[in-house]
Amino acid sequence: MKDERLVQRKNDHLDIVLDPRRAVTQASAGFERWRFTHCALPELNFSDITLETTFLNRQLQAPLLISSMTGGVERSRHINRHLAEAAQVLKIAMGVGSQRVAIESDAGLGLDKTLRQLAPDVPLLANLGAAQLTGRKGIDYARRAVEMIEADALIVHLNPLQEALQPGGDRDWRGRLAAIETLVRELPVPLVVKEVGAGISRTVAGQLIDAGVTVIDVAGAGGTSWAAVEGERAATEQQRSVANVFADWGIPTAEALVDIAEAWPQMPLIASGGIKNGVDAAKALRLGACMVGQAAAVLGSAGVSTEKVIDHFNVIIEQLRVACFCTGSRSLSDLKQADIRYVRDTP
């Protein structure tokens, strides 16, 4: 029965996120408040622009991550297959959705070594929630998640707001930081910690860095609001009223990124949450990210075909290249030095 409830919850989440009329939020990721200074004399050949980078010791053609979306339900099998095939073609990284259901049910449902066979040359990131980490069970779950897809790293997602609003959610978060510290010591792969759409503050980032986390994904407000999603799933008007108040809650992605990058400029950061296009991606990279992630924005394409996913990211890549060209940036290292200004008042 527990597995059935988890599977139904995953299916509910997919249905809601795929419908643009549902789970609406007014929160902004904040990138519209930043503006590049246009370079009218770039003095470079567009064809010489390179977006190559290294992430988790693998060479990528662009600093893009297919962010964690779905896992553990039958319908996610073809979604993850399309994403993995596209990641391999494009040479970009891929994170899978939570593997909790797959581990507890012993049913991979596409979250297995098939993904590594489909994407042998790119970083694959396993995924578990912080709620699954406490005690020895947490270490076992983490190892199984990594082994299941032969992952290059494990993502631990932090979602206290969603858990607080979700019927039956985990509201006891004591010991989660200690569990993360233990995983850093015990796991044979790097640990990536991310939020799921409410952002990571400078204070929490400091705690994670002190714990030994390798990468932080700020996953800020401005994209999918899981509070709004849980509001849509609510069984009672009272639950809905509580959840909907938090639809716009969180630290905007750009703000979280700048705060952490200023304090720890050498810390590898992923920017996700409301990245709508290649210009947002360029701004995120300039503001301190080493990688940029998208999830919901590509979910519709992933449900159709590998080619649709490739087409989607090729648009993002071309937009990013144009942004480089018009800031006089031949490479990502040049882009990180491009002139950018904070515009307080936006239309």
Swiss-Prot record:
Keywords: Cytoplasm, Flavoprotein, FMN, Isomerase, Isoprene biosynthesis, Magnesium, Metal-binding, NADP. It comes from the Bacteria. Pfam families: FMN_dh. FMN binds at residues 67-70, 98, 127, 194, 224, 274-276, 295-296. Substrate binds at residues 9-10, 98-100, 162. Its cofactor is FMN; NADPH; Mg(2+). Mg(2+) binds at residue 163. SMART domains: IMPDH. GO terms for cellular component: cytoplasm. It is found in: Cytoplasm. GO terms for molecular function: FMN binding; isopentenyl-diphosphate delta-isomerase activity; magnesium ion binding; NADPH binding; oxidoreductase activity. One of its GO terms (biological process) is isoprenoid biosynthetic process. Its EC number is 5.3.3.2. It catalyses: isopentenyl diphosphate = dimethylallyl diphosphate. Belongs to the IPP isomerase type 2 family. NCBIfam families: IPP_isom_2. Homooctamer. Dimer of tetramers. Involved in the biosynthesis of isoprenoids. Catalyzes the 1,3-allylic rearrangement of the homoallylic substrate isopentenyl (IPP) to its allylic isomer, dimethylallyl diphosphate (DMAPP). This is Isopentenyl-diphosphate delta-isomerase. It comes from Pseudescherichia vulneris (Escherichia vulneris).
